[in-house]
A protein has these predicted regions:
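Beta-sandwich/jelly-roll carbohydrate-recognition scaffolds of carbohydrate-active enzymes
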Residues: 53-59, 81-82, 94, 109, ...
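A short, N-terminal "cap"/entry segment at the start of jelly-roll beta-barrel domains
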Residues: 2-58
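Active-site or metal-binding loop neighborhoods of secreted/extracellular toxin and effector enzymes
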Residues: 144-166
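Short histidine-centered beta-strand/loop micro-motifs
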Residues: 53-55, 71-78, 106, 125-127
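Short acidic-glycine-tyrosine-enriched beta hairpin
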Residues: 95-123
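Conserved short histidine dyad/triad with adjacent acidic residue
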Residues: 62-77, 118
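Ligand-binding loop in jelly-roll beta-barrel domains
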Residues: 117-144
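Short, conserved beta-strand element in jelly-roll/cupin
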Residues: 77-93
Length: 166
């Protein structure tokens, strides 16, 4: 079985209501930080970045409850490679693949999983029927967050400062 097939089966398993509800209940005991007091996104730890186990495995795991789309914010990258598992809800995502340089619209529903590299840009532009709850598994930080603008890729601090923050 190849890696993507394994992750596909794992994603479907994690989205079973009893499994997803257990993960959510465990994660909600450990708040990481919320963006806009949770109006945009709630974030919780399952495997805290920097912990002994996280350093040993080379990953950290958070639960994200996405309560709002990215609005008019530009497409953005992340400073690490990550994999997301959709547990509940869902969304439409715009993706820019660095290798190909074109946009793709993708619907994400419970059971779906995908990986993003640090150079891939994305934007969540529509939620499906309420919040989307995801398991967010990421590796070591290798770069900064960037937002894609007509002036090129802008570091997130600069972009957020000039565009009203999150």
């Amino acid at each position: 079985m190849n890696k993507e097939t394994f992750y596909s089966y794992l994603g479907r398993f994690l989205a079973f209501p009893m499994v997803a509800d257990t993960i959510i209940k465990l994660a909600k005991r450990r708040v990481y930080s919320h963006i806009h007091n949770g109006a945009y996104m709630e974030r919780y730890w399952l495997l805290r970045e920097g912990s002994w186990l996280s350093r040993t495995l080379g990953i950290a795991i958070r639960l994200h409850v996405i309560n709002s789309n990215d609005g008019d914010r530009a497409m953005h990258t992340h400073p690490f490679k990550f994999r997301t598992f959709i547990l509940k809800g869902g969304y439409w995502e715009r993706r820019r693949y660095d290798d190909f340089g074109y946009d793709v619209g993708v619907e994400r529903v419970p059971g779906d999983t995908y990986e993003m590299d640090i150079k891939d840009a994305h934007q969540i532009y529509r939620l499906l029927d309420g919040p989307a709850t995801t398991l967010f598994v990421y590796g070591a930080r290798k770069d900064d967050w960037y937002f894609e603008t007509e002036h090129g890729m802008i570091p997130h601090e600069q972009y957020l400062k000039t565009n009203g923050g999150y």
